[in-house]
Amino acid sequence: GYEDSAEKLVEDMMANGHQKNDRATVELFANTIGEAFDWLVGEDGAAVPYQRSGKPSRSYSGEGRGAGVCKNLAERLEAAGGTLLTNTPATELVVENGAVVGVKAEGEGKAYTIRAKAVILASGGYGANDALVPDEYKKFVYAGHAGATGDAIKMVEGLDADLINMDLVNTQPNSMILPSGLGQYCNPGVAGAYKAGAYMVNQNGERFFNESANAWDLMQAMKQNEAQYLIMDQTAFDNFNAGMTNSKIYTMEDVEKWLSDDYDGQPVMKQGATLAELCEKLNLPADAVEDSAKAFNDCAAAQTADTFGRTPAAAQSEEGPFYALQMHIRYYASLGGLHINDSMQVLNTKQEAIPGLYAAGEVVGGLEGDVYMGATLFGWAIASGYDAANAVNAVIAQ
């Protein structure tokens, strides 16, 4: 059987976030995500279609992924008589006697002042705002969207709003850089590549960690390197590309372009008839890479764990061609933000609720600790939005 509980989810998230989470926010999420999910997919709720895995899981994938969920929710909102103003960013909170009573917004050449009994801030994070991202993260590649500028953080400046975990931004390993300069997760590709005998080496041509270890530990090891490269034979490379193209991250036409000798942009993807030729293109010491390959293959043949605790599922071919992709650490979702209470109200630095002001989604700080736990950011978007809407509905009904 499969046993789970809100209490277990809380402890798992606290452990994953290295106890840097705001426990009250984690408990709020764990205790309401079930009800929020039922509303999201239920016929008497939002009725958003989703993919069923057929096995116990904490994760959920809406049809059409995030865009599909947003499209369905927008259609439901408008069908219920709601008005959705796109390309109309809020610029300022309307505050009277310390209470938030509306927002000012601009869009389509028109200025709006919208008064309301309550305002929900759901403007996302600040990963794209260099002024808010701590310097230690800027050496990594940004992988978020351009709109994550932390607008709400500026909007609450005059309200003495409490901000928590503003020094934390989510980082993840297994990333490449796209031609646009943005980071891109490679999880769909690396899973198949590692099963076919792929491994990573650093700038010295040496393996440095168990590539199949958990993301946090792998990332700490990557931070010690100047660079790292995923080394693949033909089978591993085919598996990698299958995962990435099936996820519509890039096309095989892109790969052909990136592998050409006259391509000098991102990503750094190279091909060699032998490991030595591949290393020459990457300015890596061939003898070190060849030694790494031999040690890896010896463990694969004996089905024993290597120095880093990995038992290779398959050896790397001794015949070319061979391929390499430079791998990076990426950052995207911000983990800090507004401090809320269990009614989704934004708190001030005295831990008092700011009248009329609520928050949901990534603009809220403290859920994740210092690293994101799979599926919980989308889960929090749903749960916190559901909770905030219910809280505001109760206020409006009074």
Please tell me what each predicted stretch does.
Residues 153-155, 162-284:
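An anion/pyrophosphate-binding glycine-rich loop and adjacent beta-alpha core
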Residues 92, 288-371:
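A glycine-rich dinucleotide-binding beta-alpha-beta segment and adjacent secondary-structure elements
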Residues 1-83, 198-200, 204-207, 235-237, ...:
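Conserved N-terminal/central alpha/beta ligand/cofactor-binding core
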Residues 152-162, 285, 290, 380-398:
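Internal hydrophobic alpha-helix adjacent to the cofactor/substrate pocket in enzyme cavities
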Residues 63-117, 153-159, 338-339:
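Helical element adjacent to the flavin cofactor pocket in flavoenzyme catalytic cores
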Residues 1-2, 184-185, 376:
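Conserved N-terminal glycine-rich FAD pyrophosphate-binding loop of Rossmann-like flavoproteins
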Residues 193-195, 332-334, 374:
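Short, small/polar residue-rich loop motifs at catalytic or cofactor-binding pockets
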Residues 107, 114-179, 378, 387:
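Glycine-rich loop(s) and the adjacent beta-strand/alpha-helix scaffold that form part
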